[in-house]
């Protein structure tokens, strides 16, 4: 216990290890539950694809996969919104200003709940128009629209769960989100099997199973986080417009970056769709696999952000570069693992999604795309770590520019070359975009490292 600036007693948080332990140890302890959580998040997402592909067929798999690029846009709005709140929560937590921290939490939950309902209504209302605009093949359009509409009914649950997960990690707690993800992933798989294989509900059953699992997970997350916040007795405001403005200054560039990249992937999806249902099935299968491995590196980047922000808030400037270097070490280790797994098991991994119904074209597209990514995941790793440091420091403009460069390379090659020279050009430019992103971010970071006189928020 200790006395606070408000004259109240406050607990010493066990989650302050990010500002006390050795950087590599602290990041490893913090990141590993996030990495495991990312794995279960993808198990959660892939359950629909695997079960639909195995029990309904490759056309149904293509319908679910065709929704992925669009749903990612809306997910990225949630993730980007969480960044703005998370950076400030971490910094106030590091500075031990728990009243401001709780004000940020309350303000963000109220604001983003309203936003999630608005986006859910919009997405449900325009599902058919959006899928038609993506040139979704006619034979899978109805299933894709059905899946998407059920998804948007549950969107507020997904949105709030992602915001709450960011809040947990911002205070150095990565184990609770992991436990909730494991629970919801297992629940989602059982419900998928029951509704798709047992009841024969097809893509509707897969979407409904996901909605129910997300809803239960979001409710549990809220109740647990509410309990945690009550341990900090400092007074706070339920809603603060000035703090909302501070969040938005960080969140808006992140939302723009993540949403624009996802919109770019929607455009890439539109490039892939004319190649036919089987090519789309192979592409969708590897997109799921890419998400599994990429979220490992995303998790490390997400772990380094609160590490940087908490240490900046605590004025421990000497620990910032050490944390960045520790993140790069973790990225290298996982890049080697990803390469080994993909190079050895790419055919078996593809078969999980495509099953016996997949054609030679679907397997070729999936295998070629997957192996190419395996060679260059290290570029994604160093990009994510550098971006994570920029976010933790609140340096958002170079972060946004770097990611736009990445997107421009991927889009230009896909749009100009794929229709003329073949579908392979959809993925050939991916590592070049990652590398360019890293170089721009790193150049900005070298100019922006805080000095010992950097101020923490009060």
Specify the residue positions occupied by each region the protein language model found.
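Short runs within selected transmembrane alpha-helices of multi-pass transporters and secretion channels
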Residues: 82, 151-169, 177-185, 206-219, ...
């Amino acid at each position: 216990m200790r006395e606070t600036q408000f004259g109240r007693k406050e607990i010493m948080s066990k989650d302050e290890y990010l500002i006390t332990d050795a950087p590599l140890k602290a990041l490893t302890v913090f990141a590993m539950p996030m990495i495991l959580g990312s794995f279960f998040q993808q198990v959660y997402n892939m359950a629909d694809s695997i079960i639909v592909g195995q029990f309904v067929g490759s056309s149904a798999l293509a319908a679910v996969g065709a929704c992925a690029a669009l749903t990612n846009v809306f997910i990225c709005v949630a993730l980007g919104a969480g960044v703005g709140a998370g950076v400030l929560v971490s910094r106030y937590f590091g500075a031990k200003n728990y009243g401001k921290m709780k004000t940020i939490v309350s303000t963000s939950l109220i604001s983003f709940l309203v936003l999630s309902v608005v986006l859910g209504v919009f997405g449900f209302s325009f599902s058919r128009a959006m899928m038609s605009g993506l040139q979704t093949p006619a034979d899978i359009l109805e299933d894709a629209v059905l899946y998407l509409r059920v998804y948007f009914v549950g969107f507020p649950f997904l949105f709030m769960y992602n915001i709450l997960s960011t809040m947990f990690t911002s205070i150095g707690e990565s184990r609770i989100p992991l436990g909730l993800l494991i629970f919801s992933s297992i629940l989602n798989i059982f419900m998928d099997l029951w509704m798709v294989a047992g009841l024969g509900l097809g893509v509707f059953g897969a979407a409904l199973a996901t909605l129910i699992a997300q809803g239960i997970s979001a409710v549990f997350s809220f109740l647990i986080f509410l309990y945690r916040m009550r341990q900090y007795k400092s007074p706070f405001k339920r809603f603060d417009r000035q703090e909302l403005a501070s969040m938005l200054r960080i969140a808006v560039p992140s939302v723009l970056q993540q949403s624009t990249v996802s919109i770019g992937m929607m455009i890439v999806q539109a490039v892939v769709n004319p190649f036919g249902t089987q090519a789309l099935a192979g592409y969708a299968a590897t997109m799921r696999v890419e998400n599994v491995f990429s979220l490992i590196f995303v998790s490390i980047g997400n772990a380094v952000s609160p590490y940087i922000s908490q240490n900046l808030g605590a004025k421990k400037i000497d620990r910032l570069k050490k944390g960045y270097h520790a993140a790069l070490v973790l990225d290298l280790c996982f890049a080697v693992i990803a390469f080994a797994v993909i190079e050895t098991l790419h055919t078996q991994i593809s078969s999980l999604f495509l099953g016996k119904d997949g054609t030679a074209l679907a397997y070729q597209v999936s295998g070629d795309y997957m192996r190419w990514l395996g060679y260059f995941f290290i570029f994604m790793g160093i990009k994510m770590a550098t971006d994570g440091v920029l976010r933790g420091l609140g340096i958002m403009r170079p972060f946004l520019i770097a990611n736009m460069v990445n997107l421009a390379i991927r889009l230009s090659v896909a749009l100009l070359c794929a229709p003329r020279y073949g579908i392979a050009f959809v993925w050939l430019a991916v590592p070049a975009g990652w590398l360019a992103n890293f170089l721009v971010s790193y150049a900005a970071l070298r100019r922006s490292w805080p000095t010992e006189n950097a101020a923490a928020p009060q």
